Every structure is written in structure tokens, then in C-alpha cells.
Amino acid sequence: MNLKDITDPSDFKTTKLPALAELDILKRCYICKDLLNAPVRTQCDHTYCSQCIREFLLRDNRCPLCKTEVFESGLKRDPLLEEIVISYASLRPHLLRLLEIEKVESKQEVDREKSANESASNGNRNVNNDVDETVRVKDQSNADELGEEKGQAQHGEQVNEQTTEVISLLSDDEENGSDSLVKCPICFERMELDVLQGKHIDDCLSGKSTKRTPTDILSPKAKRPKQITSFFKPTIDTKTPSPPTSKASTTPTATPTTTLLKANVSSPSPVAQSTVHKGKPLPKLDFSSLSTQKIKAKLSDLKLPTTGSRNEMEARYLHYYVIYNANLDSNHPVKESILRQQLKQWEMVQHQPSFGDAEWKGAETGNWKELIARARSN
């Protein structure tokens, strides 16, 4: 196994959401500290990997957490939790990547704010240096502005006279024709009733109406054909079938975040399709009541090797008994040939020569002396 494949809740401690480490811990087995694999629940409502708790119960029949007596026959599968853990395991690297991206972006924002503050402080220094020059320029421009203001005042008087005339006309029109003017319920503009019942309501509802100018209001009424807008007309049910909605239109638009989460994420199979297991669990043998020949016959029936001593054959059966029954607890069981391959690898590890503490110290003596010499030299 590659070291990069090893996960730990502390991976989230350096991200933008360090609290996700607690969520990661809840999805791990208390015995192996890895993400739950084929989780089962004990009678005391604690959850472990099926293989982990079965191997533990071979040595001790008490719960590792609360020390309550636990029986292997009372283990209950948790298929929903297994699918949740599988989904979380597939999303975990993408989640870490997204949180790391946000962390980098927030760091860039801090750098931009810092540079903006520095430029603002430099700008304040330049402003202080230019105050005297600005005062001199203003003194010179004041004389020119006095001449311009005289001309603008004369022009402003003419504009004010024209504006006063328009406002007075509008106010007179509102006072004299207040009985004939009505207010639009959409834009609250006052107008004649026939104008309101014409195209104005439709234009207001569709957003096409424009602001009426004083010229339009003050102009004499043109003879218009009396029309009733569709707003006041009774609705007629034509009973025309609506076109079927295409699936593409109802599909939500994918965002960069959802695209990243969907990339390389395989959706697990439904729980209902994977909870059916045809195999039967293997029984736990009482080796004290079985002869060596019967043990060999049991191994032969399971297509397992019958070589080695009696103790080796008993250990072989017990380990296969654990991984076989744990495989039945999984939503995604593997073939028996793969289980036999796992058993073979396990036996190879068990037959490796043991490396004691004394031998390890002797082999590493040279390295220890070199490290001590480096520490003293520093």
C-alpha cells in the first residue's frame, strides 16, 4: 500500500473546515482506525468493521469500547452506513481539494487587501505633498469661475422660466381634469381612462411602457378606437395541450463545484440490489472434538490447503472463517477465489521470520551512533 493512500482525520485540520475531522472520525472503525468496511452493530449499539470485530471476539468476547459481553451471533449488518462510507470515501479527496482551493483563494484575497492598504498609504503621502499646489491652482481658477457664473445665471433664469411654465401647465391640467384622469395600478401614472384601457396596461405588464412626457400629457386627445386591453377581457380556456417539457430544460446547470465533485466519482449500487447474499455463514468449529483428518476434510471441502501442522490448519480455518463471514456482511461481496488469495497472502506474512527487539537494536546500532554524533556536533 502506498503511503499516500493512508487517510487520517487530521487531513482536515489544515483546511478551511477543520471541524470535518470529527465527521471523518465517526466514519472510522475503533479497532483498525480505518474507514468502516462492511460495518456491523453489536448488541450494545457500537459499530465496527465486520472482520475487525470477528477477529477481536476470537480472543475476547467483550465489546472493545464498553466491555459489555458480545456474541458473534448477535452482530447486525448496517448496509445503509456502508453505502454512506463508500460515498464519503469517493468524495473525500475531491472535498479536500475544494477546501484547499478555497484556502488558496482566501490567501490571495488577503494579499490583495494588504497591497491595497499599502498603495492607499502611499497615496496619502502624495496628497499631502500636492496640497500647496492645489491651493494655488484654485486661487487662479476662482477669477475665471466668477465670469462664467454670470453667464450661467442669465441662462439659468431663462430655463427656470420655461420649467415653471411646464409645471404650472401640468398642475392646471391635473386640477381641471382630475375627474377624467385615473392612476395606473402598475406604474401609478395618471392618464385618461381610454389610454389606460388601451395598450398601456399590456405595455406595463410586459415592461414595454415608457415614461410619458409633458408634451404627451398636454397634447389634445386624438380620436382613438375604443379598445379593451386583454387585462380587462375575460380569460378564454382554449384547452390547448401544453408541449411536453424537455428533460434538458429541467436539468440544473452544472457549476464548477458540482463538476469537480462529479468527476471520477462512481455511484454505488443501490442497497436493495446488493443486500441479498446466497452464501451461508461458516460455522465455528470446536477443534478439541475433531481429529486431524476431520479438520483436513473441512479444509478440503472449502478448497483450502491441507498442508502444515494441526495448529497451522486450525489457524488457517479460523482466519478463513472470519474473512468469509465478514464478506457476507458486505453489500459488495467478492468471489471465494479472491478470499482464498487473501488467505494465502495472510499465511505468507505469518510465516515470515520474526524480528526481535535485540536483533533490531543490533542491526540499527550503526545508525544510532551516527545520529548521536550529529546531535553532539550541532
Swiss-Prot record:
Chain positions of all zinc fingers (UBZ4-type)? 181-209
State the superkingdom. Answer: Eukaryota
Give the keywords, sorted.
DNA damage, DNA repair, DNA-binding, Metal-binding, Nucleus, Transferase, Ubl conjugation pathway, Zinc, Zinc-finger
Give GO cellular component annotations, separated by semicolons. Answer: nucleus; Rad6-Rad18 complex
Quaternary structure (record)? Interacts with E2 UBC2, forming a complex with ubiquitin ligase activity.
User: Taking the first listed entry, what is the main subcellular location of this protein, grouped into a coarse class?
Assistant: nucleus
The lineage, from the top, is: Eukaryota, Fungi, Dikarya, Ascomycota, Saccharomycotina
Single Gene Ontology BP term?
A: DNA damage response
List each copy of the SAP domain by range.
287-321
Similarity comment:
Belongs to the RAD18 family.
Q: Where in the cell is it found?
A: Nucleus
Q: Where is this region: Disordered?
A: 109-162, 233-256
- Read off the PANTHER family from this record: E3 UBIQUITIN-PROTEIN LIGASE RAD18 (PTHR14134:SF2)
Q: Where are the zinc fingers (RING-type)?
A: 29-67
- This protein's name: Postreplication repair E3 ubiquitin-protein ligase RAD18
Q: Which reaction does it catalyse?
A: S-ubiquitinyl-[E2 ubiquitin-conjugating enzyme]-L-cysteine + [acceptor protein]-L-lysine = [E2 ubiquitin-conjugating enzyme]-L-cysteine + N(6)-ubiquitinyl-[acceptor protein]-L-lysine
Instruction: Provide ranges: composition bias, Low complexity.
Output: 245-256
Organism of origin:
Candida albicans (strain SC5314 / ATCC MYA-2876)
* PROSITE patterns per UniProt: SAP, ZF_RING_1, ZF_RING_2, ZF_UBZ4
Q: Where is the composition biased (Polar residues)?
A: 117-129
